[in-house]
Amino acid sequence: SAIYHYSNSHWLSNATTGAPFIYVGDGSVKEIPGFGLGTSSYLPNVSDMVYMDMRTGEMKKISLYDATASKGNQLTVLNRYRWDNGLEWKINMKYDHALGSYLYQTPMSMEQKVLADGYSTKGLDGALNPYEGYVQSRMSCFNRGNIDEFFFTTELSRKYDYMTWRVGVNEWYYDVDYASNTTMYDHTVEEYPQMLYSADTKDIHHYGNTPYYNLNQNASEYYKGHENKLALYATHDWDITDQWNVYYGARFEYQRLAGKNLAVYNAEGNPVGRFAGYHIGAVAADGTKIAPR
């Protein structure tokens, strides 16, 4: 028999579960005025996110809906054949080609700001309006990977009156090309918060005139690799008497792992940390080029 399975899901709940509250100190919390826990949305009033592609350094925009897309194309083949003499042959095979995505919209620090701190909201006409009050910083982490998996098992067995022997082969293969792209931004603390705009500082580096800053400086990752495992096994199941049974076997495995990531070291052998604008091909302050290894 052959089975084809297609899946297409968009899981937004992880991006919408954050909420501000006041911690009382005795283990309980109070609601912030105007924000109902469990009933108010703390997701900013924008439907798109901007990010820097870790692989190319390109600036891209994607909707929150598309950023949570996970799709799978899976083919399964199952076969079993029996001979009259007790011999049986099984084949089980599965191939999966998938796109996996996971989107965080993680609240970070919350601070109270005054007008002198230079935060503004933007009106529908594009005009900036000075803002003071609580400011919530947030990290958007867009995780996405292309995955290919292959599983294959074939087994030949024969059953006698008091014993059964089996010989089989397992083959497992997994290939992944994964990256996480992170973007920082600030917003007001209220239901359906507004994005906040501010000037660059020594620690904050915006992308143009947008509210997004410090692209790929926090938690950005890249990994591309594969794993292959091949095994040969044999077993013998023997009922010596009605009370005694012996079951033994042997298994021989070959495993190979290979991959590259962005654990980059400079000429002195020290690790190079993330920085604003981090991506494959970027150059760190000490001149180290960011490249998979």
Kindly label every feature range from the protein language model:
Residues 53, 83, 123, 266, ...:
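Acidic surface patches and DE-rich sequence motifs
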Residues 2, 40, 49, 79, ...:
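Intrinsically disordered, low-complexity segments enriched in small/polar residues
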Residues 30, 59-61, 71, 80, ...:
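Context-gated lysine
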Residues 28, 47, 91-94, 238-241:
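Intrinsic disorder/low-complexity detector
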Residues 1-21, 67-103, 141-182, 292-293:
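Transmembrane beta-barrel strand/turn architecture of Gram-negative outer membrane proteins
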Residues 72, 96-110, 182-188, 192, ...:
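C-terminal/domain-terminus segments
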Residues 3-76, 101-142, 196-218:
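Acidic/polar loop-and-plug regions of large Gram-negative outer-membrane beta-barrel proteins
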Residues 2-5, 147-149, 159, 164-174, ...:
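Structural signature of Gram-negative outer-membrane beta-barrels, strongest in the C-terminal barrel
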